[in-house]
A protein has these predicted regions:
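Conserved short histidine dyad/triad with adjacent acidic residue
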Residues: 23-38, 88-90
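Glycine- and acidic-residue-biased ligand/ion/polar-headgroup-sensing regions
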Residues: 40-58
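Short acidic-glycine-tyrosine-enriched beta hairpin
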Residues: 44, 59-90
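Single conserved hydrophobic/aromatic residue that forms the stacking wall/gate
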Residues: 1-7, 11
Length: 123
């Protein structure tokens, strides 16, 4: 993923029994995320403060020969403090954070160890 500024993980802990990971993020500057999935895991995003402009992408084609997933824009919405959103396995989304933001993300597994899809936006 490409970001204009990286997130600062203020907390990341993996539960040894379930494998779930809890991550607390602080974005003090603009942060723009590329369309991505969470591989074979799901994720729950909880907005603690600020706003995130989130875009959902529709999978148009999965090309197994070059391992590329083509997507097109589906919808864009604003996540405000108190909003929570579940992203199931394979769901493609991208966040834009223009102002300071704090958020909590719960992952079904530690994403540091999971391969993510190679996603390409088509128009």
């Amino acid at each position: 993923r490409n970001h204009s500024s990286a997130a600062s993980d203020v907390y990341k802990r993996q539960d040894k029994d379930t494998g779930f990971c809890v991550c607390g993020h602080v974005h003090d500057n603009e942060a723009i995320g590329s369309p991505h999935d969470h591989g074979t895991s799901w994720a729950i995003y909880g907005q603690a403060s600020g706003e995130t402009e989130m875009t959902d992408w529709e999978i148009v084609e999965k090309n197994n020969s070059d391992d590329v997933v083509n997507v097109k824009l589906k919808k864009t919405y604003i996540m405000k403090a108190g909003d929570v959103h579940f992203y199931d396995v394979g769901h493609v989304h991208s966040p834009v954070r223009k102002h300071p933001v704090r958020l909590l993300r719960i992952e079904g597994a530690n994403l540091d160890n999971i391969k993510r899809s190679n996603i390409k936006v088509i128009t």
